[in-house]
Amino acid sequence: MISGSPQNHKKPRPNLRAKWGQAIEAIAPGFKVENVGEGGVVALKSFRNEKAVQTHPLDKKTPCSLKRQLQVPKGKSSLLKIRCSYHPHGDWQLRVLANSKVLHDQIVSFKTVKSEWLEVEVDLTKFAGQKIDLALENRPNDWRNEFGFWHSVQVIHR
C-alpha cells in the first residue's frame, strides 16, 4: 500500500540530475547526459579495475547520450578520445555524431573489443573553425544488458 499522494512518487529526487551531471563531468568534462534509462547514471569506483560511469538507453529506440557544444580551433589538430566498456552479459552500440552526422559507429562487446576496454579515437580536425554539436550515444542494439561503461572522454587539441 502506498500512502500519500501518488504524484509525489512520480517526481524524481531533487538532486538526482545534479548527481548524474557530476558523475559525467568527472569522466567527460564539458558533456551533459540526456535520455537516461534503467539504473540512472552510476559512478563506479571500480569496473574492470578502473573508475567508470554506467549509463543505459532510455528505451529500445532512444539512446542515452553524452552531449556538448565544442568550438574546434583553427590551426590545431583535434581528437576525441573515448575509453568505454560493456556489461559482461551484454553489448551496446557506440555512435559518435557531430552536427547529427555519424563519425563512428561500433558495437561494444566482448566479441568486438576482445579486451576489457575499447579505445576509440575520432579526428575532429575537419571541423576546425566551427562550433559543433557533439554527441556520444549509448545506443541499444538487441536490448539485452545495454549498459555502457565510460572510463574517459577527452577532447584534445594539439
What does each model-found stretch correspond to?
Residues 2-158:
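Gly-Asp-aromatic-enriched flexible segments
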